Curated annotation (Swiss-Prot):
It comes from Synechococcus sp. (strain WH7803). GO terms for biological process: tRNA methylthiolation. Its cofactor is [4Fe-4S] cluster. The gene is miaB. Its main location: cytoplasm. This is tRNA-2-methylthio-N(6)-dimethylallyladenosine synthase. The keyword 4Fe-4S applies. Keywords: 4Fe-4S, Cytoplasm, Iron, Iron-sulfur, Metal-binding, S-adenosyl-L-methionine, Transferase, tRNA processing.
């Protein structure tokens, strides 16, 4: 590793979820505070960090492919520092070093804020593995944000659920909620820098506060996601607040009412349902029924009729019959989601479902995924149709990389929208502006339109 006065450049590749993206921003901030600068290309970097995901096997295999390329590079460039962070690192630990001996540092997601300390150990000539359970300290790190308009703020780490297909609890640890004032302080700092939108993040965000002490006079927990939203809503300068990812088991009417009543809360909800069949949900150990999920959606649409809904779903779970799969298709059509992230079941290490003997063959997985993706796209296109001819408030996030004359941004309902950077009065719009856009054209997953004079 290079001496501190000659740190050189770094490159971070992020796989997986929004939590990983937020972790990568923090680690980039640490590296830049140490004197590193971002490289112009991965193969030019003096330090390469892969922040990894193990939710699905294909993401994990992609990491090993990337590592093989960098390991070969390190054999001719011993000054290269090679780091694997995130969930694959946590899952594999020291076995990663045996598989890729060129690695300098293997670190689980709970150790993201310790990157400088761990690299100092690498400086001293050690190969370092940091995967032990660790209490996550407050986010005192100044993150290097990928956007100057929209930011992530972690509010709870880890997950206490035990879904039979999911590896997250074993790699991200138990739930650890941050204190409300610390979260608000971070949001105030971002707003002071000009950020307009914050997404509050948690693997299971509506479980926020379960591990914090305190009971209200009414007998409920003192700290909940609903209370947190009320606490941070008055941050000056912020225009929008979102949160993800929700679990139906903890999604309450009180939370829905807060989203409807607090003006900065966006009318977009990401609530995975995973299956439209109760027996499959029971086998997954999800802890709710299809009927409960429907009640949540009905309540959201009662309070916010135009709210957008997105979800995650798994097809070809072990033992899933054709009839059970058809119930999932029916639920998607019934609810009319704006977007659904789909996946065929992938056995993951250290999960109960991976050991069951009723795994479905690959051809069924491929066919069910193909069919459900076609349905999801059709539903998305139909849902997007309601925007045609409407005027929507769009937060401009930056230039359309495919057309520099356009800006791109999102509606409050999270619809990606493209529009001219120049208004009818020759006004030039820029990132951070809230623009009223007349929607001229709709596609399955995006909108385009014309900015109106404000």
């Amino acid at each position: 590793m290079l001496p501190s006065r000659e740190r050189g450049s770094y490159w971070i590749t992020t796989f997986g979820c929004q939590m990983n993206k937020a972790d990568s921003e923090r680690m980039a901030g640490i590296l830049e505070s140490m004197g590193y600068r971002e490289a112009s290309a991965e193969l030019d970097a003096d330090l390469v960090l892969y922040n990894t995901c193990t939710i699905r096997d294909n993401a994990e295999q992609k990491v090993y492919s990337y590592l093989g390329r960098q390991a070969q590079r390190k054999r001719t460039n011993p000054n290269l520092t090679l780091v694997v962070a995130g969930c694959v690192a946590q899952q594999e630990g020291e076995s990663l070093l045996r598989r890729v001996p060129e690695l300098d540092l293997v670190m689980g997601p709970q150790h993201a804020n310790r990157l400088e300390t761990l690299l100092q150990q690498v400086d001293s000539g050690q190969q370092v593995v940091a995967t032990e359970e660790h209490h996550i300290l407050e986010d005192i790190t100044t993150a290097r944000r990928d956007s100057s308009i929209c930011g992530w703020v972690n509010v709870i780490y880890g997950c206490n659920e035990r879904c039979t297909y999911c590896v997250v609890p074993s790699v991200r640890g138990k739930e650890q909620s941050r204190l409300p004032d610390a979260i608000k302080l971070e949001m105030e700092g971002l707003a002071a820098q000009g950020f307009k939108e914050i997404t509050l993040l948690g693997q299971n965000i509506d479980a926020y506060g379960r591990d914090l002490p305190g009971i209200t006079p009414e007998g409920r927990r003192q700290h909940t996601l609903t209370d947190l939203l009320h606490h941070v809503h008055d941050v000056e300068g912020l225009e929008r607040i979102r949160f993800a990812t929700s679990h139906p088991r903890y999604f309450t009417d009180r939370l829905i009412d807060a989203c409807a009543d607090l003006p900065k809360l966006c009318e977009h909800f990401h609530i995975p349902f995973q299956s439209g069949d109760n027996d499959v949900l029971r086998a997954m150990a999800r802890g709710y029924t299809v009927e409960r999920y429907r009640r949540i959606i009905d309540r959201i649409r009662e309070r916010m009729p135009d709210a957008s809904l997105s979800a995650d779903v798994i097809v070809a779970f072990p033992g899933e019959t054709d009839a059970q799969y058809r119930r999932t298709l029916a639920l998607i059509e019934e609810i009319g989601f704006d977007q659904v992230n789909t996946a065929a079941y992938s056995p993951r290490p250290n999960t109960p479902a991976a050991d069951w003997d009723n795994q479905l063959p690959e051809d069924i997985k491929v066919e069910r995924l193909r069919e459900i993706n076609a349905l999801v796209e059709r539903c998305a296109r139909e849902r997007n149709g309601r925007y045609a001819g409407r005027v929507e408030e769009v937060l401009a996030e930056g230039i359309n990389p495919k057309d520099p004359s356009q800006l791109m941004g999102r509606t409050r309902t999270n619809r990606l929208t493209f529009f001219s950077a120049t208004g009818a009065d020759d006004r030039r719009y820029q990132a951070g502006d809230l623009v009223n856009v007349h929607i001229d054209a709709v596609r399955s997953f995006s909108l385009s339109g014309t900015p109106l004079n404000c």
